[in-house]
């Protein structure tokens, strides 16, 4: 079994760019940014429980990273960058820390490296279980209306929230809930030590208005790019800023 993905081919000899979306997104999420790099072959992946991979269920991060590896092999992708937002960034960091032959580097946008205390994990597990129950039992429009009121999305205006609620409400609530629990921060290892000892290139993108993830970025041994005029979802709020950072990283 492999993950559903959309492949776009560029010039031979350059590494692939493998894009991983955030929670409740899909393979289209990164395409405005990715299509600015047409010289590179691009793979836009649907993570389990999402988009064309909605029917794929997993029990944890190891299942997700295993599926990602199989997917890359199936496309004969032997030289690549992982580019991930939020959940996709966490998957990218996990996969890279476990080891991926052919990995050039990881570019993470607003991805959490992991909680550091049992108390934080317990709090997060309770919170994610409550959200998962809502995703399973309530209309998605109602759930996402509340979801986008969370502090991490404080930089969004009312129109941006309405647009995201409408877009995300096309998902399957049950499969989102399952993926939320399987990849909760409560069950993710703290990756800080692994990332400090890494052998791959590591870049971190965060929005100028995203104080939480700017603080997290400062804890990581990563080259950090702060994207102006953006909050947590920088590639949506300022795609041109993210394109500029990726171009600098890739020396495009």
Swiss-Prot record:
One of its GO terms (molecular function) is 2-succinyl-6-hydroxy-2,4-cyclohexadiene-1-carboxylate synthase activity. It catalyses: 5-enolpyruvoyl-6-hydroxy-2-succinyl-cyclohex-3-ene-1-carboxylate = (1R,6R)-6-hydroxy-2-succinyl-cyclohexa-2,4-diene-1-carboxylate + pyruvate. SUPFAM superfamilies: alpha/beta-Hydrolases. GO terms for biological process: menaquinone biosynthetic process. It comes from the Bacteria. It holds the Pfam family Abhydrolase_6. Keywords: Lyase, Menaquinone biosynthesis. It is an enzyme of class 4 (lyase). Its EC number is 4.2.99.20. The keyword Repressor does not apply. Pathway: Quinol/quinone metabolism; 1,4-dihydroxy-2-naphthoate biosynthesis; 1,4-dihydroxy-2-naphthoate from chorismate: step 3/7; Quinol/quinone metabolism; menaquinone biosynthesis. The keyword Lyase applies. PANTHER family: 2-SUCCINYL-5-ENOLPYRUVYL-6-HYDROXY-3-CYCLOHEXENE-1-CARBOXYLATE SYNTHASE, PROTEIN PHYLLO, CHLOROPLASTIC. Catalyzes a proton abstraction reaction that results in 2,5-elimination of pyruvate from 2-succinyl-5-enolpyruvyl-6-hydroxy-3-cyclohexene-1-carboxylate (SEPHCHC) and the formation of 2-succinyl-6-hydroxy-2,4-cyclohexadiene-1-carboxylate (SHCHC). Monomer. Belongs to the AB hydrolase superfamily. MenH family. This is 2-succinyl-6-hydroxy-2,4-cyclohexadiene-1-carboxylate synthase. It comes from Escherichia fergusonii (strain ATCC 35469 / DSM 13698 / CCUG 18766 / IAM 14443 / JCM 21226 / LMG 7866 / NBRC 102419 / NCTC 12128 / CDC 0568-73).
